[in-house]
Amino acid sequence: MVKSCRRSFLKATGAAVAYAATPVTAAEESFALSYMLASSMYGKTNLEEILPEVKRTGSDSIDIWPMGHANQREQIETMGHDRFRDLLERHEVRLGMTTRYDLGPYRLQDEMNFVKAFGGHQIVCGAKNANGDTLKEKVSNFVKSLSEAIKLAEDLGVTIGIENHSGSLISSADSIKYFCDLSPSKHLGIALAPYHLPQDANLLAELIEHSNDKLAHFYAWQHGMGCHKPMPKPLELLQLPGHGVLDFGPAVTALAKIKYDRHVEIFMHPTPRGIPIVDGTAAVGDVINQAKEYMSRAIARTGV
């Protein structure tokens, strides 16, 4: 297994080097991605230290995570909302969204108001199971159960993004398609995580196109060797674009085709949770920027 992983890692590294040899010009990048920075990539690092990294990573906003994977959401409550607002203004950073798996889809009312108050536009959480004889019926009943949350989201101008998390109702390709078809509002969409899907570049592109305007968020995140057991750092980083073997070219082509104008997050999970993906705040930003460079090369070579 280790030898196979090492071959995959070397293969991916070689491919990344090959892409690096291809020059990328502004003219070639007719389609561009807008990036958001996930605070969880820095573990429990202080927000004061993370916020300058938003601009350095070419992002325009931040995704705030709570305890479990990070603790920046709790940091905000400790420092106070006025202090958080001051920090955002000082570093010229916007709150993009919060990720609240801890709340689930039925307890988002207060968080939606928080996000709105800071100019954010989205909350991501997971799905809940629902009754039904078929997968489509279960998805339909889940969507119907969100009617009050959708109404508040519409009133506030906030989107609820449901991630296709493995083991949840919205996890398979079919469930994602049903969910996007049945969502009655642009304020309820899919937060698409390739990590939790078969590592098939064409399937990923198909799901992006099918989701279309219901694609609320895209994680540039592949499965690699997974994220549930300790492993050497190079193997853990196989979750990142340009490190693992998943080709994101078809994905960016599909994103361009649907004129995707929401955010992309360079993403992964470390083991254990709650630590930075690599040691050192600047080093985390460097790793994210390397993955972004891969995404830019993917755009350039697809000609979108």
Question: What residue spans do the PLM features occupy?
Answer:
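Hydrophobic faces of well-ordered beta-strands that scaffold small-molecule active sites
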Residues: 33-39, 62-64, 95-99, 123-125, ...
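Glycine-rich, proline-tolerant flexible connector loops at the mouths of alpha/beta enzymes
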Residues: 63-83, 133
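Active-site beta-loop-alpha junctions enriched in small/polar residues
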Residues: 38-42, 65-67, 100-103, 128-130, ...
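Histidine-acidic metal/acid-base catalytic patches
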Residues: 2-34, 45-57, 173-188, 192, ...
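Charged helix-capping and loop-helix junction motifs
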Residues: 76-82, 109, 138-146, 174, ...
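Alpha-helical scaffold elements within enzyme catalytic domains, especially in hydrolases
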Residues: 53-56, 87, 114-117, 148, ...
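Active-site acidic/histidine proton-transfer and metal-coordination neighborhood
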Residues: 13-21, 48-51, 91-190, 199, ...
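Catalytic domains of carbohydrate-active enzymes, especially glycoside hydrolases
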Residues: 50-67, 118-119
